[in-house]
C-alpha cells in the first residue's frame, strides 16, 4: 500500500507528518519525501521514537541540500542540479522573448540518486 500526504518543505513539517504516519500506519517501512528538509525532520522524529533511519525505516529526500550529508545518518536523496535548472530556465525565457513562435519545449534534467545511510533494507 502507499500513503501520500502533502506538506511544506520544512523540518517541522517532516516531524509532524512522521508522527501522524507512525500513529496511523505503524508498520511503515519507507518514506519518500518531497524535499530534504521534510526528510531531515522525519529522521529527527524517528530518532525521538528510538527508531533508526535506514535501519528501522528508510528515508529518502529530494534536493541534496548541504545538511543532507552532514547529519547522522546521512540522508539518501535525489540531486536535481538547481544550477542546471536555472540555466535552462534563463535560456527558455530569452528564447520566448526573442522569438515570435512559441513551440512547446521539453528539457531533460538528469537527477542523480545519492545513496547514503538513511535508506536500506527496512
Residue ranges of predicted features:
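Bacterial carbohydrate/catabolite-sensing allosteric modules
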Residues: 1-122
Amino acid at each position: 500500500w502507499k500513503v501520500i500526504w502533502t506538506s511544506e518543505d520544512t523540518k517541522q513539517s517532516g516531524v509532524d507528518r512522521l508522527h501522524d504516519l507512525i500513529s496511523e500506519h505503524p508498520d511503515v517501512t519507507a518514506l519518500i519525501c518531497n524535499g530534504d528538509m521534510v526528510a531531515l525532520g522525519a529522521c529527527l522524529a524517528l530518532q525521538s521514537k528510538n527508531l533508526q533511519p535506514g535501519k528501522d525505516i528508510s528515508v529518502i529526500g529530494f534536493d541534496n541540500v548541504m545538511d543532507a550529508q552532514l547529519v547522522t545518518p546521512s540522508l539518501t536523496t535525489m540531486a536535481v542540479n538547481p544550477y542546471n535548472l536555472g540555466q535552462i530556465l534563463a535560456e527558455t525565457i530569452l528564447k520566448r522573448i526573442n522569438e515570435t513562435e512559441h513551440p512547446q519545449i521539453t528539457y531533460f534534467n538528469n537527477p542523480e540518486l545519492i545513496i547514503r545511510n538513511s535508506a536500506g533494507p527496512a
